[in-house]
């Protein structure tokens, strides 16, 4: 399964290179083995206000990312996320180390992780969410950016960014979002990814 996932991700990356698009997205942390008792974990959330860590927190960016994530989750009756300084610190450290190459590689940490390059903050979330357009609810076979965003058991979020100057895109944003508990747990999507609530759709 891990080998097939790796091949799938590599094909996506190759396709994006062939198409020649600067914008790219990627998701990490597909859990292949998990005990039911470990699915519900404590919340890391402590809010945006009062952050006193070592990284600069752009509160406008943080509030926007949290709001847009929760707007998407509300459409699927998923519980709202809360901001986590621990996740923000993790995402910030990883973003700071990015070489601005345009190649997306994951941190390999214990959190769920969405990456984007060349998108605006809202554009990144829209691109991730749009992968759910053809999603078959109740399926246990598809796990992507969309399912990561709306995964009901996830309760904490931390996002960071780095501004990159490239030959094709000045001030392109590299965006990292970390999620906890990580979603996309094989065998649990039907319990965590719910259909659109028709009452919430305009």
Curated annotation (Swiss-Prot):
Domain of life: Eukaryota
Signal peptide interval: 1-20
One of the Pfam families matching this protein, by short name: CAP
SUPFAM superfamilies xrefs: PR-1-like
Residue positions with a glycan: 58, 152
PROSITE patterns per the UniProt record, alphabetical: CRISP_2
Record family assignment: Belongs to the CRISP family.
One GO location term (cellular component): extracellular space
Keywords: Glycoprotein, Secreted, Signal, Virulence
Predominant subcellular localization, coarse grouping: secreted
Protein name: Probable pathogenesis-related protein CaO19.2336
Induction: Expression is higher in white cells.
InterPro entries, A to Z: Allrgn_V5/Tpx1_CS, CAP_dom, CAP_sf, CRISP-related
UniProt subcellular location: Secreted
Biological classification of the source: Eukaryota, Fungi, Dikarya, Ascomycota, Saccharomycotina
UniProt keyword annotation of Magnesium present: no
Annotated function: Secreted protein that acts as a virulence factor during infections.
Residue span, SCP domain: 66-179
Gene Ontology biological process: sexual reproduction
SMART domains named in the record: SCP
């Amino acid at each position: 399964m891990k080998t097939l996932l790796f091949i799938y991700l590599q094909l996506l990356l190759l396709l994006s290179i062939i198409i020649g698009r600067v914008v790219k997205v990627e998701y990490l942390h597909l859990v292949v083995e998990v005990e039911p008792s470990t699915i519900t974990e404590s919340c890391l959330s402590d809010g945006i206000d009062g952050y006193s860590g070592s990284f600069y927190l752009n509160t406008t960016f943080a509030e926007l990312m949290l709001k847009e994530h929760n707007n998407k989750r509300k459409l699927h009756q998923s519980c709202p996320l809360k901001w986590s300084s621990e996740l923000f610190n993790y995402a910030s450290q990883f973003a700071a180390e990015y070489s601005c190459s345009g190649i997306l590689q994951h941190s390999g940490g214990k959190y769920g992780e969405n990456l984007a390059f060349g998108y605006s903050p809202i554009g990144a979330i829209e691109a991730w969410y749009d992968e759910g357009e053809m999603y078959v609810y109740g399926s246990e076979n598809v796990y992507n950016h969309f399912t990561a965003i709306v995964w009901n058991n996830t309760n904490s979020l931390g996002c960071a960014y780095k501004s990159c100057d490239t030959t094709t895109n000045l001030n392109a944003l590299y965006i990292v979002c970390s999620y906890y508990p990580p979603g996309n747990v094989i065998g649990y999507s039907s319990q965590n990814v719910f259909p659109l609530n028709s009452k919430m759709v305009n």
